[in-house]
Amino acid sequence: MLNFRHAIRAGLVAATVLVVAGCATVKPEPNLVAFSTTLRGGNEVPPVMTDATGRVYAVLDKNNLLLRWKMTYAGLSGPATMAHFHGPAAVGENARVQVPFQRPITSPYAGQATLTPQQAAEMMAGKWYVNIHTRAHPGGEIRGWMVVQP
């Protein structure tokens, strides 16, 4: 009976070591870069008074420059008429459209686009933002700067 208990105990220890070792070797994919932002009216230039808010989460694959994103929003003054990634610009500046979102723009929304090397570098440098436009705010109702997540 003692040998059976010893064998069970040894088996449990070995299984625990394997599980811990397996977890220790799991690493995040080094070629994927995660971004996120919160969309607010106060981030627009000039600022917009609105109760609307939103979130954008994106992942850039540095191997093929494929950008995938998901966006949610609520509280807009009306239906979203357009949404885009803009850049390059510093925070507080406006920039040209880099990647337009396909219509219809609804929440939740998901999209993807292949970036140029220059676009990917600008996004990695924090020089891109997302904004959502409405009829009441044709210049954009809410905006957020894409930030690399650690």
Regions found by a protein language model. Give the residues of each.
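Metal-centered catalytic cores of metalloenzymes
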Residues: 2-5, 19-83, 87-150
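N-terminal export and membrane-targeting signals
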Residues: 6-10
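Bacterial N-terminal signal peptides
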Residues: 11-21
